[in-house]
Curated annotation (Swiss-Prot):
Ranges in a coiled coil: none
Keyword set includes Hydrolase: no
Location (main, coarse): secreted
Protein name, UniProt field: Kappa-scoloptoxin(07)-Ssm2e
Residues of the propeptide: 20-41
Bilayer-crossing regions: none
Task of the protein: Inhibits voltage-gated potassium channels.
Annotated family: Belongs to the scoloptoxin-07 family.
Subcellular location as annotated: Secreted
Lineage of source species: Eukaryota, Metazoa, Ecdysozoa, Arthropoda, Myriapoda
Keywords, in A-Z order: Cleavage on pair of basic residues, Disulfide bond, Ion channel impairing toxin, Neurotoxin, Potassium channel impairing toxin, Secreted, Signal, Toxin, Voltage-gated potassium channel impairing toxin
Gene Ontology MF terms in the entry: potassium channel regulator activity; toxin activity
Annotated tissue distribution: Expressed by the venom gland.
Amino acid sequence: MLVFYALLFVSVFSNTVMGATIDMPIPKPILREAIEEIDVNKRADSHYCKEENCPPGKHCPKVPIVCRRGPCCF
C-alpha cells in the first residue's frame, strides 16, 4: 500500500512540476513586446532623441536605430 501511494505521489508531482516548466514556455509575442519597450526606453534616454512620434520604419540619421513607436531620433 505504501508503494502505491509513493508511486502515485511521484507521478502526480512529476507531472505537475515538469509539465509546468517544460510545457509552458514564455510566449514569444510578450517577450518581443518587452524587448521593443526596452529599445524604446533606450531611445528615450539617448541625447539624439526628441519627444515626437515618427512613422514606422524611419531610420534615425545619427544613430542606426529603426523607430517603431514612441520617441524618435533626429
